[in-house]
Each structure stands twice: as structure tokens, then as C-alpha cells.
């Protein structure tokens, strides 16, 4: 496993979004109504779950809507998501006015994940009435670990994230092995037609609320 300093052993400093990225571009999609399901690129929405991933779509109908990957996507507007940042490794489609993408030649997948997480710590500042756009976006500051020259330590951020990935993988593998032992090597899950079935009222399963108007 990679050996890397603890977070609290590193020196940190504040950096603005404007200073971190060589380019910040608006995403190019115009309307989700014209997206067609496919397997070309992901649609990255202004969302707070699944790293913004909504679904896979075709790029053939609107190739001009595709943004380059290896970028950090800024959620500028959205239902509880404004102020979040997502690292996106591959080309994608985002909706203009809702997201923007930042590019930095030094960015890698691991350092991108690290920086996106740090930027997302500003989420509480932004909302529908206080969007993450214009000067508010460019002047947003985030704390990052620095190297001996006082610059963002991309090498450290990459190694730290990789170590976290490896640590989580070990935990998942240990859990999977334990579950196999608990279940027994020859355990079988019954087929659907081998289970007993019965009818239930929807109200027995869900709490149903009726909402009238606004």
C-alpha cells in the first residue's frame, strides 16, 4: 500500500477557483428534452447524488453539446446541489446555465477527486437565490495541501486519494469474504417460483400522503 503523510501533517493554503483552473467553460447542452438514451456519453446533471450522473445518452444528435472530460464540474444551480463539485474523467454532456467545467493540465483522476471534495465544502454558501456563477464562482476559495513552493501539491493529493481507494478496496474484499463464509460455500438463493407469494395492499407497505396544490 502507498505510504503517504496524514492530512494533518501537511501544510495547507487557500486558493481561488480562478487560480486553480487554466480554463472554466460553460457546459453546452440546451435542453434535456432533446437528449436520447444511448451509450456514448453520460449526462451530468445539476444533482447532489451519484457524482452528478443521471444517465447515458447519445452524442450523435448534438455532438456540439459534448464537453471534454478530465474536468471538475461545478454545479451552479440545482435542487440542493448548488455549490457541489464533481470530478468527471470522461467526455460528457451538461446543461448550459446549470453547470460549468474547470480544466487544469495538472489534474488527474485522483487529484481531481480530492480537489472536488474540497471545493464541495463550500456548498452551504450557495442556493437557488445565491447561485455559483460569475465572480462568486471565480472568487470561491478552498483549502488545499501545498508543496515546498507553496503551490497545490497534486502529487500528494493523488497519492492520498489512491491510498484511500486501496484501503476501501481491502475493506470491501474482507466484507465479501466474510459474507461468503457466513452464507456457506454451497448456499443457494431460491428462485422466484420457489418462494411463497401473497397479495398486500399498497397502504400496508407505504405511508401514503396526499398533497393538494401549492
Could you say what each language-model-derived stretch is?
Residues 56-59, 127-133, 167-178:
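Short, tandemly repeated low-complexity microdomains enriched for cysteine and small residues
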Residues 17, 43-44, 73-76, 85-87, ...:
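General detector of folded, globular domains
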Residues 36, 66, 133-135:
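Intrinsically disordered, low-complexity regulatory regions enriched in Ser/Pro/Gly/Thr
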Residues 47, 77, 145:
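Structured beta-strand/turn binding interfaces of compact recognition modules in eukaryotic regulators
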Residues 55-113, 117:
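A short beta-sheet element
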Residues 88, 95-103, 115-147:
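Glycine-anchored helix-breaking recognition loops at helix->coil/strand junctions
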Residues 12, 38-41, 69, 90, ...:
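Sequence-level motif detector for i,i+2 pairs with an aromatic at +2
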Residues 1-31, 35-51, 149-214:
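Non-catalytic DNA-recognition/assembly elements of restriction-modification systems
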Amino acid at each position: 500500500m502507498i505510504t503517504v503523510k496524514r492530512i494533518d501533517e501537511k501544510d495547507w493554503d487557500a486558493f481561488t477557483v480562478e487560480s486553480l483552473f487554466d480554463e472554466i467553460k460553460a457546459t453546452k447542452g440546451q435542453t434535456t428534452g432533446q437528449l436520447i438514451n444511448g451509450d456514448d456519453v453520460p449526462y451530468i446533471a445539476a444533482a447532489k447524488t451519484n457524482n452528478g450522473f443521471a444517465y447515458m445518452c447519445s452524442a450523435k444528435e448534438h455532438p456540439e453539446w459534448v464537453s471534454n472530460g478530465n474536468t471538475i464540474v461545478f454545479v451552479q444551480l440545482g435542487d440542493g446541489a448548488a455549490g457541489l463539485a464533481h470530478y468527471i474523467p470522461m467526455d460528457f454532456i451538461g446543461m448550459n446555465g446549470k453547470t460549468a467545467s474547470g480544466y487544469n493540465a495538472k489534474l488527474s483522476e485522483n487529484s481531481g477527486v480530492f480537489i472536488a471534495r474540497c471545493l464541495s465544502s463550500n456548498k452551504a454558501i450557495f442556493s437557488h437565490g445565491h447561485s455559483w456563477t460569475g465572480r462568486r464562482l471565480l472568487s470561491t476559495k478552498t483549502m488545499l495541501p501545498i508543496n515546498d513552493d507553496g503551490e497545490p501539491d497534486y502529487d500528494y493529493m493523488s497519492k492520498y486519494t489512491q491510498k484511500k481507494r486501496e484501503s476501501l478496496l481491502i475493506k470491501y474484499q474482507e466484507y465479501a469474504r466474510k459474507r461468503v463464509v457466513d452464507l456457506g460455500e454451497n448456499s443457494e438463493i431460491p428462485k422466484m417460483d420457489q418462494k411463497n407469494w401473497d397479495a398486500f395492499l399498497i397502504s400496508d407497505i407505504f405511508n401514503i400522503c396526499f398533497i393538494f396544490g401549492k
